[in-house]
């Protein structure tokens, strides 16, 4: 009986709850990519999507980087609070905290701006028929996963 109690207690301790990260510093290193496909909601046609991810892995796959996209002319601005949030349930799989949003863009050049806690990162995003190309202007806390992302993949 005592052994069963010990095994049960050890199992519960190992499982652990889905908890929020202990500090806002968990979003210090963010990687982003531009993708084309059915990434957010699946409308009739593919979308161009910005996906940000933390370097840290979390015990639930539905942690989110608290952020908001604003679009003005040819500027795409993502304002981040630095907080990581989670819904009411834990989707039990390991993964980074993420932010995904559809971008209302077509071919051409855009300013891509990330702002968080007084820091601003700036990139130029060039959309062509074949690819999404990223040029770094100024970077403090973000970095592209690549300088070029092929379309449709």
Where are these regions (language model features)?
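Sec-dependent bacterial lipoprotein signal peptides
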Residues: 1-16
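Compositionally biased low-complexity segments at domain edges in trafficked proteins
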Residues: 137-153
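Contiguous segments within soluble domain cores/interaction surfaces
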Residues: 54-88
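Contiguous beta-strand segments within globular domains
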Residues: 40-62
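Bacterial Sec-dependent N-terminal signal peptides
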Residues: 13-33
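Short acidic/polar inter-strand loop motif in beta-rich domains
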Residues: 84-89, 116-124
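A short tyrosine-centered beta-strand micro-motif
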Residues: 106-117
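An anionic, turn-rich surface loop/hairpin at beta-sheet edges
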Residues: 80-105
């Amino acid at each position: 009986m005592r052994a069963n109690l010990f095994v049960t207690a050890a199992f519960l301790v190992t499982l652990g709850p889905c908890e929020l990260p202990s500090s806002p510093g968990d979003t210090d290193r963010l990687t982003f990519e531009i993708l084309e496909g059915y990434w957010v909601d699946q409308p009739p046609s593919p979308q161009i999507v910005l996906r940000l991810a933390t370097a840290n892995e979390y015990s639930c796959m539905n942690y989110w980087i608290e952020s908001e996209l604003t679009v003005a002319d040819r500027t795409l601005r993502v304002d981040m609070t630095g907080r990581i949030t989670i819904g009411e349930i834990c989707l039990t799989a390991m993964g980074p905290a993420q932010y995904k949003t559809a971008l209302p863009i077509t071919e051409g050049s855009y300013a891509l701006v990330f702002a968080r806690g007084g820091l601003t990162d700036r990139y130029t995003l060039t959309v062509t028929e074949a690819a999404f190309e990223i040029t770094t202007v100024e970077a403090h806390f973000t970095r592209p996963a690549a300088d070029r992302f092929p379309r449709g993949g």
